[in-house]
Amino acid sequence: MHISVYERDRGFVIEKLLQGEFDYVDTADEVFEADFFRYIGAGGILKKLAESYPSPRKKHDVPVWLALGSSISMRLHGAEAFNKYEYVIRCGGMMNAFGPDLGSKFADDDNGDIKIACNGFNNKNAYNRETPCHPDYLRKYFRDTDAGRAEKWYNTEVAKLFKKRRAYNKQGLFIGDATYIFVPDNPKYECSSKLLFDEHNHPVDPNKLTKKELKTGKYQWHRCYKLVTLLHIYPELDCFLIAGFRLLPGKASELPAFYELLDSFVDAVGKGVVKRVILDRGFLDGQRIGHVKKTHGIDVLIPVRKNMDIYKDAIGLVDEVEFCDYVEPSKAKPNKKTKAKPKTIKKREAKRRRTNNK
């Protein structure tokens, strides 16, 4: 049995980093990732996701669950390029979670480097594999996946699975949000928009600025998308869950897209999951808010700012009303039930009434 012993030596590590003797640096926790994949693997969550995923392939040389798991692992490591997949597998916990069927890690006897041996899935490997599947397969697989179908899959099928796993709490508190995602200035980014932003990353209209203002350096052009999200909030855990999303061109309005997203989410998970939605003034639309309340029974909360007309209206109404100290009303004393009259008295009164009526 081969046993490897590691000693913590920060000085040695820093020295090697300064000398450039490293291939890949990662901040992810291998143990946490392994526990995470054991949970979604043993619970059948990963296979359930694979069954409903809108795969672009009719024949799968690599299981869909492995492609999804590999993508999730890369997201946990913050890796965006698929050519980093080899490093993610090497230092992550996915291999440990799924055991020898996926592959095995071992230390090289000559130099002590960590090696990976994978069997693969299609029996077409002429050489030893160091990853469960080729990184280029993942790149092509997710590139060929229809973006609209993948978006709908997350907003419906994944949302249903979250509900089945009791991911939504009883408070039913959600937040609607819209943010810009900047990408490199390449027109090949489909449906992207090129907008002018100020120093706080707020879009501005270039037609409303003078040439002098444009030359101050406070404004920059960015190619971007707009991400509209429906977030489920867990106040006691200080975290949130992305319950649904829409990816739009940067110049598109988030207002109609969000309410369509909310309608489809409620249709998928049913009424009662969403009880309150907190929005900013960008989502202010009386007709749509009324529809959400009447159709789904959802309360919409929009914080008021001092520069909003509704705030000024409220302050104006306050000035016209006279206020006085609140006095709690006294509680009325309960009426005491009268005692029933004795039978003898009842007979005398009845006899007296008969006499008076004659």
Q: Model-found features: residue ranges?
A:
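Gly-rich Lys/Arg/Thr-decorated short loops/hinges at beta-loop-alpha junctions or inter-strand turns
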Residues: 239-245
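Basic, short loop/linker segments at the boundary and entry of helix-turn-helix/winged-helix-like folds
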Residues: 22-72
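An internal, acidic/charged active-site-proximal segment
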Residues: 247-358
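Short, conserved catalytic/metal-binding motifs centered on acidic residues
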Residues: 70, 85-86, 134, 138, ...
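Short, positively charged, Gly/Tyr-enriched micro-motifs
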Residues: 59-154, 235-236
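Active-site-proximal, Lys/Arg-enriched surface segment
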Residues: 135-235
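Phosphate/oxyanion-binding active-site loops and adjacent basic polyanion-contact surfaces
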Residues: 63, 81-82, 222, 250-259
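Double-stranded DNA-binding cores of transcription factors and transposases
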Residues: 3-15, 61-70
